[in-house]
């Protein structure tokens, strides 16, 4: 037994070999038998299955079986019209303990020393030349049924690795690896790559390569493996693992991407997976594939429809062009590798080089985990994995890392950036900023936004200070040298605050210090200048972040932004100023803004009705475009020698904003004591129209003792005098050419017309669709809201002697 365990050297083709590797047993999760019935097969497929089984039986790959295990077997016809036998091993795989992958990635052919001669071989039917452990064979039994059960079924079991078995790839790698280990031991100075059934040998001289290959042939045969004689490559160009290998250059094999099959998410996912696999050779920066990556966004259903956009089509064309022209280099095993980091658009690009020879490209993923990733952090994030990649390729850290930073910026990065400290941990090589002089990298689209230029980390001296605030009702405001309030559609306080900061950055073209009570917005604004913004399914948020970044980058002057806690009651000017900004978006201020937008009430009326300051009330009116254009300097309402009601009627000419139609005769009444006014739209100016107007006035103002009118026919008729007599009203008319009463009426007309125009053009009320409704809204504003010069109450309060307040009862 001991002699059997010792290495037993035998002679084969004149070369000393060792005992072949033994079969590798499987580990089972359970001892429970697995039996899946064989389904019926058509006669044609059944005949093909019998032929294939006999062929495998003759080759010794299967043997007759009486196993209590069974898996279904079937055949498929290949394009060549030949049949292929497959076994459905899903049920058996479920009870096998997985071994795990041994080669999680492809070996890089760039590590093959340049100018070394090569031989590449392919093992023939590798799975079928590797034996199963004897105790595992019965688990892979299958049945060939008979038509109509006219005879017993024929049963076989596999003696070699069956295709579709969970651990067949791992066992194949292990078995071939053990067969090649004596070759590696004896020819340690040769470079041997083994990936499944593909084997590449390189040696410094052709004689050394021949010796190595001769020994390898013997070891492969001794292990029971067979070399495919028609696939032996001994001259350039070599084809290995999808690459075309020459003496010094390596190129991707020429392929054409089919675009007509790209219809679903699954199609694009596979395409981009294949492109990503070859990108380290092609050198396509992340920014050049943004539109292709964007197609993967949206519905996660693999069958969800996707469309190839014109921009993405151009990017596929770029990939095809790179496949035709891209190349990397085989290395000099004695020279160290270096890492170059280029500040490309979107995210940095890494390049592994040796002297000036390109070895491999390195990129960051298109999407990030964090909402904002600083460009400096992206550089550090790229350096870390690329260092590990270089160690994986050659076993050593890069000799030098070249970055687009000055020595002082590198020093500051080590002090302030945690990502930088992690990415360059334990690095003992050189950090430089001098790039090699070569045209290889000139096509890269570089960015200048590496470190902040506009954003400052310390407060600016001799700069304006502006406080911002946003509310969940969509109102945003800032206060400082001037105040501004904006209504936005956002129902999030943070998004409203973001709009406030953007507005400040746009409005102040000078150095500024911004103080906000949103820590989230402050951090976002600090980082956004050089950050990669993570895509969000929220389009609204994407637009805000992109607008913030564009606004910051377009500025000509620096800014500083910091956070202040709201509602702390701390003493000092900062807290007070922040409260002032809060007040601008508070409920009282917002209600004042909304009322003015509806009615265009004057500043005194706003101050009287709401808990706002004079400055805030005036600012609301001054920021109204209608009130700025139409408001004239405030005049006193005029004085009449006696207290009475003045009446006037006249036809109003059609105004561009007032379409009165048939109701173009506006009758106006004004109380000389309170200046309370009442007006109605009528179709004429006869006595009947005057009486109708007065009854409307009585319903609002009550019945007056005196009425003063002009000498119009509607006021001098007997019918009108009889009407006044019934209501016990004294009537007088104005003295011709005496303007005391007439001036009040004319000013009232002008005030009413101006108010109507303002509300019609700039009011928020969409319900006032008829002339009388428009007139009533104007009268409500003038009587119940506005306060005029030298007055402390509204006209309605002056008339009744009571303070206006919301009605507490119900209108029935």
Swiss-Prot record:
Gene3D superfamilies documented for this protein: 1.10.10.200, 3.30.70.270, HIV Type 1 Reverse Transcriptase, subunit A, domain 1, Ribonuclease H-like superfamily/Ribonuclease H
Free-text domain note: The LPQG and YXDD motifs are catalytically important and conserved among many retroviruses.
Nuclease found in the keyword field: yes
Miscellaneous field: This protein is synthesized as Gag-Pro and Gag-Pro-Pol polyprotein precursors. These polyproteins are thought, by similarity with type-B retroviruses, to be generated by -1 frameshifts occurring at the Gag-Pro and Pro-Pol genes boundaries. Exact N-terminus of this protein has not been formally described.
Catalytic activities: DNA(n) + a 2'-deoxyribonucleoside 5'-triphosphate = DNA(n+1) + diphosphate; Endonucleolytic cleavage to 5'-phosphomonoester
Binding site for Zn(2+): 596, 600, 624, 627
Chain ranges of zinc fingers (Integrase-type): 587-628
Residue ranges of domain RNase H type-1 in the record: 460-590
Gene name, Swiss-Prot/TrEMBL: ERVK-18
InterPro entries, per the entry: DNA/RNA_pol_sf, Integrase-like_N, Integrase_cat-core, Integrase_Zn-bd_dom_N, Rev_trsase/Diguanyl_cyclase, RNaseH-like_sf, RNaseH_domain, RNaseH_sf
GO MF assignments: DNA binding; RNA stem-loop binding; RNA-directed DNA polymerase activity; RNA-DNA hybrid ribonuclease activity; zinc ion binding
Record motif YXDD, residues: 195-198
Family: Belongs to the beta type-B retroviral polymerase family. HERV class-II K(HML-2) pol subfamily.
Claim: RNA-binding is one of the keywords in the record: no
UniProt domain Integrase catalytic: residue ranges: 637-803
Protein name: Endogenous retrovirus group K member 18 Pol protein
Amino acids binding Mg(2+) 1: 469, 497, 517
PROSITE patterns reported for this sequence: INTEGRASE, RNASE_H_1, RT_POL, ZF_INTEGRASE
Organism of this sequence: Homo sapiens (Human)
Function according to Swiss-Prot or TrEMBL: Early post-infection, the reverse transcriptase converts the viral RNA genome into double-stranded viral DNA. The RNase H domain of the reverse transcriptase performs two functions. It degrades the RNA template and specifically removes the RNA primer from the RNA/DNA hybrid. Following nuclear import, the integrase catalyzes the insertion of the linear, double-stranded viral DNA into the host cell chromosome. Endogenous Pol proteins may have kept, lost or modified their original function during evolution.
Record GO biological process: DNA integration; DNA synthesis involved in DNA repair; DNA-templated DNA replication
Residue positions of motif LPQG: 161-164
Domain Reverse transcriptase: 57-245
The protein's Enzyme Commission number: 2.7.7.49, 3.1.26.4
UniProt keywords, alphabetically: DNA-binding, Endonuclease, ERV, Hydrolase, Metal-binding, Multifunctional enzyme, Nuclease, Nucleotidyltransferase, RNA-directed DNA polymerase, Transferase, Transposable element, Zinc, Zinc-finger
